[in-house]
Amino acid sequence: MSKPSGSFQEHWDRVYDSSDVDKLGWWEAVPEKSLHLIRQCGLGKDDLILDIGTGASTLIDRLLDDGHRNIIASDISEKALQALKHRLGPERASRVTWIVDDVTRPQHLCHLRDVCLWHDRAVLHFLTEEPQRQAYLNTLRAVLKVGGFAIIAAFHLTGADKCSGLPIHKYDQTLLAEFLGEDFLLEDHFQYTYHTPSGSPRPYIYTRFRRLR
């Protein structure tokens, strides 16, 4: 499988090489807010779930625990996904489809279809240039089925200007709705202040949209 190139991949490979996963500034032992929104969707166990920017997230562990059988974990960093595979172990890792790709320049994601749930915690807000944001939206629209759900969590307007040394494009629910456009209905949203492993507060906006057409 070809690897995505460019500074984002190099940055995230360095991050996952240089720190224990549970010390990273976005680590969650239990991703409760994402799970809450996912469970609201009423998905079947074979419905296709695509997690964008998986990293070494425990969300995949929890989705497997919940009995989901059609999960794709995607990240620009192969090192991040390898860390997650190692934690899951061979048997559980074999139940997940793994895609190393850049959502803004997809080589593999763009071929997916009929995704029932697009989940993104903290990818979109790293895309600060309009062409990147448009490419992200193009990928989302290409793969997510009508009637499917998009759960997006990003740094809130009141949050930090940078994460992991990179600049951030911050959002609230209105800005996310404007970004996705009128083909997406905002069904739920809430603010949540996450605390990093070192104790620093990070205000997020969590949203759940349904694709109408």
Stretches with model-predicted labels:
Residues 119:
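A conserved beta-strand element that flanks and buttresses the S-adenosyl-L-methionine
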Residues 1-113, 127-213:
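Class I (Rossmann-like) S-adenosyl-L-methionine-dependent methyltransferase catalytic domain
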Residues 122-126:
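Short catalytic micro-motifs in class I SAM-dependent methyltransferases
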